[in-house]
Amino acid sequence: IDTIAHHHDFFWERQRYQTNAIVDLLDTAFPAKLPNIQHVTINSIAKARLKARRGISSIVIPNVLDFDTPPPIIDRFNQDFRSDLGLQKDDLFILQPTRIVQRKGIEMSIEIVNRLDLSKPQLFISHRSDDEGLSYWRWLKREASVMGVDVKMIDHLIGPNRGTINEHKIYSLWDAYLNTDLITYPSLYEGFGNAILESIYVKKLTVLNRYPVYNADIKPLGFKFIELDGFVNEKSVQEIRQLLNSPDEVRKTTEKNYQLAQEHFSLEVLEANLKDLLSNF
């Protein structure tokens, strides 16, 4: 059977999967090297590692979003999101749109909030840790307490779809994005970085860490963000302060990012790549 194998992550990319009882089997059979399988990776680093480790060629098809459909807007439902967080009109809503796992570098987000010298230093995190335990979350809370930052999980307010439970609104992640003033995404490692595409889609000011795949496959295309290089420095903090008070400059930059994303990470790009892939069978 002709098969397309689409690889988002490989076991060798995660330290937590390195201790196992079937390493020989994994190293020799996963993924399978067969003539009827065409392999797809989501970044150029994974492509190179797959070739080096298994001798398997692949094509890169990056993650995409429907950039030809305009993003949602603030409406009668989501206009209450900030107040449901307990925010006042002049408070900053700083969103970390990730799970609570160590490779997300959330300690850098906490430090950013601390160094912005806000009257109410708060960081809101959209998702729980899931299967990676609570030790990192406990450590983050201690770090935040030392730095005087109020870190809040808001997963109880966010669901796959909008709705109401016991007369309380449940919002979509898009509702959270639309209400934010600053998105933090200081990841140390990502297979691609969906939150980057999402932040581009909603045209919001974003600070990110230059993780390897970003450096290899996203930054060279011309996108512009506030960048960290593994740590928070005063230059980045000053840039955040300046842009938070420069909505026209943010609008210009985010519009340019949106146009670049339409060119490189749209559904039309995916369709063209899939047509090329299927034509090889």
Show which residues each predicted segment covers.
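Carbohydrate-associated surface elements
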Residues: I45, V64
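A charged, aromatic-enriched C-terminal amphipathic alpha-helix characteristic of glycosyltransferases
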Residues: L244-L278
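Short hydrophobic beta-strand element within catalytic cores of glycosyltransferases
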Residues: L205-N209, F225
